[in-house]
Amino acid sequence: MSGSALYETFARAPLAFDHGEGTWLVTDKGERYLDFAGGIAVNSLGHSHPHLVAALTEQAAKLWHVSNLYEIPGQSRLGQRLVDATFADKVFFTNSGAEALECAIKTARRYHFVKGHPERFRVITFEGAFHGRTLATIAAGGQYKYLEGFGPKVEGFDQVGFDDIDAAEKAITPETAAILIEPVQGEGGIRPVPTQSLKRLRQLCDQHGLLLIYDEVQCGIGRTGKLFAHEWSGVAPDIMAIAKGIGGGFPMGACLATDEAAVGMTAGVHGTTFGGNPLAMAVGNAVLDVVLEDGFLEDVQRKALLMKQGLAAIADEFPDVVEDIRGTGLMLGLKCAMPNTKVNMALRDQHLLAVPAGDNVIRLLPPLTVTDAEIHEALNRIRAGAKGLADAIAVAAAK
């Protein structure tokens, strides 16, 4: 037995943080780190944002939990605000992204059931996807490393290559219920789906009577410079799962749907004990207060351009370390020319936190509130880390 009482499911970095201030994290030893990991795209407004702290503490002094047996005013308000800002007519609140995806999958299957087609339950997904860690969502993601050892894969998911819309079309059968896609893959390596591909998927869904589901758990809530990433394409889904940034660090998610898509989600067919609790709703409403302020998303776009230009210069200077820059908005990736774990360690040595992803990519996911000065500081640290790695390559080559 190890010395820890915790499951050994995480390869944790040897860092423990005492508190956070905006874009900065401070360890229990007083060391400061520039946080461009953002709790894996969760801390949309950074650490200890005063508006979020005030909303949470005010609600905490009043009411924490009553269950969904009763009306929750904050839930009704946040639901209406999400409806007003999106394609959706209905919202179901959850505690996480995986729960939001479970709700999305159930909504799609239930739709076909009440329409008289219970045989339509299969969902087409894409290589490199990550939709959560439940038995259904690891089946949807289709990655062997997450499926291994958990028994038979949950039936009903058909995976095709990333952005292979021809293959998606060929995968449609009389049993297909929906197509599920991340407009920008996060875990898969910061891979945006081209607008034309989303348009074709929408056409296929309309042609075959399928529902189009977006997973915007990581790329939503302003991360790309729009409230939701799919807005760049103008292609609306029927169902969408969100989480991470909407809670700003508090555990919450939501499944959004049109009236038509949600027609089967009647009383008793789905539920949650904690989803939509007063604390989460207070924080979610506070996040929207900030993100929906006039000019906020435009400023995210401006800062994203500043950061991307700086990263491109680093890639040009150190091609043996960084091959390419990916992403959109403040959801950016370094496609590494060496193992991304080495690059991640080099950045951590510079007291900059980032997140490894698939396809040998390092994710950079700063708060949407990051300042220009902090972006320049991050670029300086990334350049220093890249230079150290490039110098080591040169020394090794000279031997």
UniProtKB/Swiss-Prot annotation:
N(2)-acetyl-L-ornithine binds at R133, T272. It is found in: Cytoplasm. Pyridoxal 5'-phosphate binds at G97, A98, F130, D215, E216, V217, Q218, T273. The modification N6-(pyridoxal phosphate)lysine is found at K244. GO terms for cellular component: cytoplasm. Its cofactor is pyridoxal 5'-phosphate. Binds 1 pyridoxal phosphate per subunit. It holds the Pfam family Aminotran_3. Its EC number is 2.6.1.11. One of its GO terms (biological process) is L-arginine biosynthetic process. GO terms for molecular function: identical protein binding; N2-acetyl-L-ornithine:2-oxoglutarate 5-aminotransferase activity; pyridoxal phosphate binding. It catalyses: N(2)-acetyl-L-ornithine + 2-oxoglutarate = N-acetyl-L-glutamate 5-semialdehyde + L-glutamate. It comes from the Bacteria. Pathway: Amino-acid biosynthesis; L-arginine biosynthesis; N(2)-acetyl-L-ornithine from L-glutamate: step 4/4. Keywords: Amino-acid biosynthesis, Aminotransferase, Arginine biosynthesis, Cytoplasm, Pyridoxal phosphate, Transferase. SUPFAM superfamilies: PLP-dependent transferases. Its main location: cytoplasm. Belongs to the class-III pyridoxal-phosphate-dependent aminotransferase family. ArgD subfamily. Homodimer. May also have succinyldiaminopimelate aminotransferase activity, thus carrying out the corresponding step in lysine biosynthesis. This is Acetylornithine aminotransferase. It comes from Mesorhizobium japonicum (strain LMG 29417 / CECT 9101 / MAFF 303099). The gene is argD.
